[in-house]
Structure formats: C-alpha cells, structure tokens
Design a protein with these regions (language model features):
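Polar-ligand-bearing catalytic/cofactor-coordination segments
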Residues: 4-301, 311, 315-408
C-alpha cells in the first residue's frame, strides 16, 4: 500500500491540522483478535513446558545423559544440558512459531518472506541462543554453589552487565546476520534526518535503514544498541510508504528514546525484575524440591536439572509483573512522542504517521483493558493520534518539557 493511496481525514491544512482517528478494518479486528489467542497460547506453553519437564522427570534424565557424555565434568554437563534445553524448547515451540510468524502473516497479506528464508532465520536464532546459553548458564549454577544464600542477588545484579553486553553485540554482530543494514537510500531525506539528529546531539552515523521489504509489508522503526553501538533503525518499508515529514516525526520519536535514556531505565527495570524473580525462586524452591524432588529427578537447586523450575517460577513472576512493566513502557512511548512533537513541531505529520502505522500494520486504534494490561507496550493509536492533535505548547507560549534536550 503506497503512502499516497491512503485517505487521511484532516480538519484543516498545515502543521497543526487535526487528523481524525480512523475506524479499524474488519481484517485488522480479526488480526488483533487472533493475535490475542496466539499470545495466550504462547504464554500457556511458556509455563506448561517447564512444568512438563519437571513433573515427568525428563529434566533429570536429560541432565543424567549430559553428565554421562561430559564424564561428570560440571561445566561441560551444564553446557550440554543448556544445548538440550534450548533445542527442546525450540522444537516444542516450532509449530506455534511457524504459524504465528509465517502462515498467519501470509494469510493477512503482511509477509513477503519465503518459507526457506523464515526457516533459515529460525535456525540462526536457535543456534545463537544455543551458543549464548551454553556459554553463560554455568554462572548462576556456580553462584548457587559458592553462595547458596545470596546467589539470587548476585545473579540478579549480573543481569545489568550481561544485558549491556548483549545490547553492544546485538546491532554490530547479530542483527546483520538476519538483515541488511546501510545508510539511507534517499539523500535528501537522509540530510533532513541528519539535521534533526544533529539538533539532539546524535551523530549522523547512528541513523540506519534496514532492508525489510523482502520479508514484510509492515512498517517499523526502533532504537537499538548501547553506548558506541547505539543507533536508530528505520525499516525501508517505512521510508517508502511514509511522507518525508512523517518519517521525520518517527525519527523524532526515536530520538526521544535516545536522548531520554530509556535504554538505561529498561536495564534497571529488568535487573530489578530478574532479581525479584530469583528471590522468589530461592524462597519456594526448597519446599518444591522437598515435596516433588523424587518426581523432578533432583534434590538440590544447584543441580542444572532445576533449570525448568527457575523458568517456571520466574515466568510466573514475569507474567504477574507484566502490567507494571508495560505501564512503564507506555509512559516511555508517550514521552518519546512528546519529544518528537517538540523537536519537529509538526502535529499533523505525527498524527498522519500514526494513521499509516495503523493501516499498514493492521492495528486497531482502541484495544481494551486486558490488552493494555498484558500486551500493550505502546499507548493505543487512538490516544497517540489525539495527543498528536492537541499537544502544542509552543503555540500557547508555554515551555517545552524537553526543550533543553535539543537545539532550536
């Protein structure tokens, strides 16, 4: 769908013209509802799989096999168990992942990816997960052995540096394995975006365009990386379908995440949440092992066969904490919208960009309470369009909330 084929209702012309919230198409409503069903299925499977590995004793048998192959060497046993666990998880989830990521996307006209390409990306993702798990899983089990009373605290605190490491490595070494990144193809638009980024103190080398049109018809943009690897990435589908002023607002929004240091907030929040989850595991593990240890096939938490127990309890805690984590995410997105509006001062372009996101991504403008509690990482598009229509303090002579974060 080309940008000029969309009909966007406005009440006036110019940068302050208001844009009406469009009604969702029947296809978008169907896509939204089917997404809710898939989310519920994936969430249930996330909890059922580790429970099954525990209560069938399969986890203990896998550890026994790994231990035999590793000749009872602890680190090698943990690495082999990690490989087996990731492969079991990947294969169990494969039918659901295939349907959600390939079949469903093609059924709704959102994907252009071939089956071979999808399976190739899936295999690469599994291989990378296997590698990281085999290299890192020994850390919590080593801490469990040397500090059985405080292992949960040390492991939780290690979440921060490990997350930073992944964020540094991801855009430079991992993401290019899946997609082609480069400078923007439109020199005029690139210069326009570079000027905007320069006002916020972001070097022009941090703006990338990624070739996604071979995989999808959806549009997106995001901030990735940490420190020297931090960058703003625009999908080529977004650049092709949005007007230049709409792209400029989208970049302004991503600049908001960049200069407001939302990545640091995410790292701190993730560290606290992981630490809380591990503390709860620490508190309940003794009782669970005492009651079900014979069925589980292990009698100590520092046995790597306990990994499904950590995954089960940790997953339940993460699910319970989702409403709070998603509320924080929605606040960050709103503030990024605010900074994007302040730095571009083009309300109309912002509202039009949200309309195009709604139509190209088969989104619904208003979701509902349950969605917002358990899935809503962004404000409803209707709220974002209405906010874009009305937020213009510069016209009323009021100070900008983030006026000190960028040059005029």
């Amino acid at each position: 769908m080309q940008a000029d084929s969309l009909s966007i209702q406005t009440s006036d012309t110019g940068a302050t013209a208001e844009v009406a919230v469009p009604e969702p198409s029947a296809l978008a409503v169907q896509y939204h509802r089917s997404g809710n069903v898939l989310w519920a299925a994936a969430t249930a499977l996330d909890l059922l799989l580790p429970a099954a590995l525990l209560f069938t004793g399969l986890s203990g048998r896998v550890r026994h096999t790994a231990e035999r192959l590793a000749r009872a060497r602890r680190f090698a046993t943990i690495a082999l168990y990690a490989v087996a666990y990731v492969l079991i998880q990947a294969l169990v989830f494969l039918p659901l992942s295939w349907y959600a990521g390939y079949v469903r996307q093609h059924a709704y006209g959102l994907s252009t990816e071939t089956a071979a390409a999808w399976l190739g990306d899936w295999a690469k993702a599994v291989a990378i997960t296997v590698g990281f798990s085999a290299l890192l899983l020994w850390i919590p089990y080593w801490l469990l052995r040397i500090s059985p009373r405080r292992w949960w605290l040390w492991t939780g605190l290690l979440t921060a540096p490990l997350t930073v490491l992944v964020m540094i490595v991801l855009p430079v070494y991992i993401a290019p394995l899946f997609d082609e990144y480069g400078r923007m193809r439109d020199p005029a638009l690139e210069q326009r975006i570079e000027r905007l980024a320069a006002r916020a103190g972001i070097p022009d080398s941090r703006i990338y365009e990624v070739r996604k049109s071979e995989e999808t018809r959806q549009v997106n943009a995001y901030v990735t990386g940490f420190g020297g690897s931090k960058r703003i990435v625009l999908w080529d589908t977004l650049v092709d379908r949005l007007q230049p002023d709409e792209v400029e607002f989208v970049v302004g929004h991503e600049i908001g995440h960049f200069v407001l240091r939302h990545t640091l907030t995410v790292i701190v929040g993730a560290t606290l949440l992981v630490t809380l989850s591990l503390w709860i595991v620490h508190r309940v593990a003794g009782w669970l092992i005492a009651r079900f240890g014979r069925r589980f096939g292990f009698d100590r938490l520092d046995d790597v066969a306990s990994l499904p127990l950590l995954a089960l309890v940790g997953g339940a805690v993460m699910l319970a904490a989702s409403p709070a984590a998603l509320a924080l995410s929605r606040w960050q997105e709103r503030e990024a919208d605010r900074l994007g509006l302040e730095i571009t001062r083009d309300n109309n372009a912002a509202a039009r960009a949200f309309v195009r996101l709604q139509e190209d991504n088969l989104a619904v403008p208003r979701t509902g309470l349950l969605f917002r509690l358990w899935r809503g990482s962004h404000p409803d598009l209707a709220d974002r369009i209405e906010f874009a229509n009305r937020y213009r303090p510069w016209l009323r002579g009021q100070p900008l909330r983030y006026g000190d974060r960028f040059a005029p």
